[in-house]
Structures are given as C-alpha cells and as structure tokens.
Amino acid sequence: MCIRDSDKPEERADYYKRIKDLEREGDKLTHLILDELGTTFITPFDREDIHALASTMDDVIDGINSCAKRINIYNPRPISDSGKELSRLIQQEAVYIGKAMDELETFRQKPAALRGYCNKLHDIENQADDVYEHFITKLFEEEKDCIELIKIKEIMHELEKTTDVAEQVGKILKNLIIKYA
C-alpha cells in the first residue's frame, strides 16, 4: 500500500502510521494466541503448529511494516514498477493466507483447497524472486547515485524477504495437511 499508492513523502508517512498501527494489532493477536495456547487443554491441532503458524503470520506483518518504515525513513525516489509489483505480490499472498485460514476448520476432510492456496503462495514467491533478481541486475547497471542505490536495494530486499516469509506460512500449512489429512 505504501509503495503502490504514493510517491509523496507526507502520504508515505500516513501510510506508514496506518501500517504500523495494523502491525501492533497483529502483535496483540499473536500474543493472545500464544497466551491461549498455554491455558487451553484441547487445541484443533498441535500447539507447536499453532505457535509456528501464528508466529510466521506475524512475521509477514512485521515484514510489511519494516518495508513501510524504510520507505518512510529513507524517502527514496519514486519506487520503480518492480517495487510496485513486489508490493502487489505481497498483497496477493496476504489474500491467499486469509483464504487458507478459512479452510482450517475443514482441511482434514477437504485438503485440496488448502493445498491449492499453499501452492499459490509458493508460485507467487517464485514470481517475486524473478522480479527481484531482474530488478537488482537493472539497479546495479543503471543507478549511479550510491546512496539511492543502497536505499532502494534495502527496501526491495525487505519486500522480497516478506514474500519468502509468506511462502513459509504455506509450508507450515502443507505440513498440517500431511500430518492430519
């Protein structure tokens, strides 16, 4: 959102504040889940799996927040189409993670839908790798301002890492399918 919707510093600051607020809400939910794990006798699946899933989903939100923070602090030139594409891919991953969560109640009886969302997360992460590699090659060939190069490279690297973490959510979910289906 911070990348795709604005190249103006004041709007970036507003987006960053909104993203930071959402990240804090995510932290609260993660802590609530982890606290409940310690007091709940029966869980829908292993505590370790719930812990891994909640923590990794929180890491996705943390990655998005980290990207927005870097954009706000570094104030780079307008983000390239590659940055906007990585942002779009992260948004797609978030949608598929949400859809995957909706499948958790029934995945033991019908694992195909959950498996499909996990595969989508993997495919999107592969697309993100391609976008990132192409962008980095072009950045080092074309960018002459060393400071700008460092700022943009850090932001793009953080975006790409966030797609990796979202894929990890899919891997955790696939392990649940294997374990329980």
What residue spans do the PLM features occupy?
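Long amphipathic alpha-helical coiled-coil segments
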Residues: F41-D49, Y74-R88, E141-I152, N175-A181
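Short, charged, amphipathic alpha-helical segments
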Residues: A13-D21, R47, H51, D81-K84, ...
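Charged, well-structured binding/catalytic surfaces in domain cores that contact anionic ligands
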Residues: T56-K138
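Long amphipathic all-alpha helical oligomerization modules
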Residues: Q109-A181
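Conserved small/polar residues in nucleotide/adenosyl-binding loops
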Residues: M1-D5
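Internal glycine-rich alpha/beta core junctions
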Residues: L22-E25, I124
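Heptad-repeat coiled-coil alpha-helices
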Residues: K8, D35, T39-I42, I73, ...
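Hydrophobic/aromatic-rich structural module bridging two neighboring secondary-structure elements via a short loop
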Residues: R12-L22, L29-D62
